[in-house]
Structures are given as C-alpha cells and as structure tokens.
Amino acid sequence: MANQHANHSINDFKQFVKKHPKLIKEVRKEQRSWQDVYENWVLFGESDPIWDPYREPEEASEAVPETPQKNDFVSKMVTAVKKMDVNQMNEQINKMSQSISSLQSLLNTFSGSGQKHSQPGSGQHPFSFRKD
C-alpha cells in the first residue's frame, strides 16, 4: 500500500512539473535540484505562491484567488508537522542529545579552571527520553 501511495505521489508530482515548464528549465540549468523541488512541493503543495513565477501566464491568473488560510504560516507548519515521521524525529533528537552530551563532556575535559569536581548527571544525556 505504501508503494501505491508513493507511485501516486510521484505521478502527481510529474503532472505538477508538466504544468510548470519554467521549473523544468531552472532544474536543467542546475539552479535547483529535483529533490529540492519535490520537497517544496510536498511541504507547500501545488497552490502555494512560491510556484507563481514558474506557472504559465494563464495558469497564474487562475491560481490567484486563494483563501487566506492557505497562505497562513501556521497552517503550513501544522501540515508539515503532520507529515513528519515520528520515529525519524525521535532518532534525530537522540543523535542531537548524544552530540550535546559529547560536547559537554569535551568542554568539561578542557575547562581551564582545573577543577576536578563532577557535575551531577554529567555522564547522562542532557535530555531524558523514554519509549511510550
């Protein structure tokens, strides 16, 4: 089922690209990558104003009447959060936590004061996460 969704998404993106020939030219001139275009398409959708410069002139006039809610930053952020993979976010947060812990350890090692006192919890990660 995930494969069908991916194929459907790819076909929708292909249709979107066909409607925006200026976008194709920009990618071919290596000003943008297809990955960048696809990620923006997934995050913002087809009707976002960022695509206006790439539309055909008659299509751009059709896309002008939009609801103010679609242009709202908060609604875009909510949409982006809904599309996030929770496991991937958890993995990234754990990596960041380990990096911060390593940095704290490094700073404690090279602190110039010469004090040898240990902070409580210095061997632990700075953030406490549990699995639900």
Swiss-Prot record:
InterPro entries: YlbD_coat
Pfam families: YlbD_coat (PF14071)
Bias (Polar residues) ranges: 108-122
Sequence segments annotated as region (Disordered): 107-132
Domain of life the protein comes from: Bacteria
Name by which UniProt lists this protein: Uncharacterized protein YlbD
Gene name of the record: ylbD
